[in-house]
Design a protein with these regions (language model features):
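Glycine-rich phosphate- or other oxyanion-binding loops that anchor nucleotides, phosphorylated ligands
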Residues: 1-143, 155-179
Length: 179
């Protein structure tokens, strides 16, 4: 199946687990752990196509990740305020739509996760099945459950999203311009 697509830069909203990933900052994960369930995870499920195993050792394209990081440097150099960028990290994909419990976040931290979101899987593995390079540009919108005295509210998340998406949009424009 040729879709004419060769690369995907996914934009994900995440909660921060790692102490250096602050709300309003950007992360470019290099690994992920999938905690989701009951999602269609393959085009090769035996119904449509014969089962096919893919190497998913490195789920994100390093070439695209480097272009995202370069775009962040370029956009930061043009901005008076700039944005903090975490150049790697482990993305935990949870089921949603509810946010995680404090205990779940403690477990994710013990598992080595730096950020948590509800999107990104199975998208990353589906892209790999189709031989489409894939990377994530993650906008941190809040501290994960139990990591801040402040309650997590949708209003707070939307406020950070609104401000952060201007920066993300500038990064995407920079990536597209140099593709």
């Amino acid at each position: 199946m040729d879709l004419g697509v060769t690369e995907i830069v996914a934009v994900n909203a995440v909660g921060a687990i790692h102490g250096d990933l602050l709300p309003g900052s950007i992360a470019v994960p290099d690994q992920l752990i999938d905690y989701s369930y009951s999602r269609d995870v393959s085009f090769y499920d035996g119904k449509l196509k014969k089962v096919h195993h893919i190497d998913f050792t490195n789920p994100y394209s390093d070439a695209i990740r480097q272009r995202i990081l370069q775009a962040a440097r370029t956009v930061n150099s043009r901005s008076q305020t700039g944005c903090e960028v975490m150049s790697s990290g482990v993305y935990a994909c949870t089921q949603g739509p509810r946010l995680e419990t404090a205990a779940e976040i403690r477990r994710l931290a013990k598992d080595g996760c730096d950020m948590v979101g509800m999107t990104g899987m199975p998208e990353a593995s589906l892209a790999r099945e189709l031989e489409i390079d894939y990377a994530s540009l993650a906008l941190c919108v809040n501290w994960a459950a139990g990591l801040s005295e402040e309650a997590i509210t949708l209003e707070g998340i939307h406020s950070v999203l609104e401000g952060g998406m201007q920066y993300v949009s500038a990064m995407i424009a920079e990536i597209v311009q140099h593709s």
